[in-house]
Amino acid sequence: MISFLLCLAILIVGYFVYGKIVDNTFGPDDRETPAVRINDGVDYVVMPQWKLFLVQLLNIAGLGPIFGAMQGALWGPVVFLWITFGTIFAGGVHDYFSGMMSERNDGASIAEITGKYLGPVMQNVMRVFSVVLLIMVGTVFAVGPAGLIVELCSQSGASGVLTSLLFWLIIILVYYFIATFISIDAVIGKIYPIFGICLIIMAVGVIVGIFTNPAYTIPEIWDHFGSMHPSGTPIWSFMFITVACGAISGFHSTQSPLMARCMKSEKQGHFVFYGAMVCEGVIALIWAAAGCSLYEVTGGLNTGQIGRAHV
């Protein structure tokens, strides 16, 4: 448990110290942002900072720091180190610069920015790559929640269409299209902050539950500094690609332009982009700790056997 708290403290300190170094390196100033200068009422809309943060958090987080971190717990508490230092020195830097570069280029997408600096060939490559990536991620982020809703409905005694995976997939896809085609502050700006708060509350509830229940203990890094993977899978490089969201994910660069078009000031970038990534790192750290704590051994993540962690 001590190692978890240390990693949590390092993440928080990293936001204020290294995050500020990153911010100063970029050099935000008082120039007009795209949201103020363009302000078309659709994609370019000034939104309050707290809302920017929560929307950005949900855009980059979602299921990623939960599923990935829980799978990362298969390697044991050593995953805490990757989440902590990956977030501070890689993920936060990536998210900040991808968002601020977009802001400096009138809210351009990652493909457009790539084309500006690397030419039209790489721009088209990035466009294809982004579309394929977004389809894959969108599929997971549709099937995952739909499956959870079906499970909840089944457990509550519901039947018929409410327990149909296809039904909930259609509902989610309809929501996708509505949120995409109308003004960003009409749906995303109103609903996403609520979901973002729910994501944070859920993580806080998990860690409070672990701390207040003496039956569970978070194992220490120094007691298990090595791979605990039940299949003997090595830490390098499999743990690093398993835990992407929550440490570093290139996918975030496709999402950052959304909020880059809604900032009132460049000085909000530190909190919105770097801060949201640190918050995602904290969420991933909590779920990784839950994975290490709630299961008898790390193999329990595969078998579903819950018990007291070995420390």
Locate the predicted segments by residue.
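Hydrophobic alpha-helical segments and their helix-loop junctions in multi-pass secondary transporters
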Residues: 138-156, 163, 167, 180, ...
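Helix-loop junctions at the membrane interface of multi-pass solute transporters
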Residues: 70-74, 98-102, 242-268, 272-277, ...
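Membrane-water interface regions at transmembrane-helix termini and the short interhelical loops
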Residues: 101, 112, 143-156, 172-195
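Extracellular loop-to-transmembrane helix junctions
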Residues: 2-19, 72-102, 111
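Membrane-interface "cap" regions at the ends of multi-pass membrane proteins
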Residues: 10-66, 268
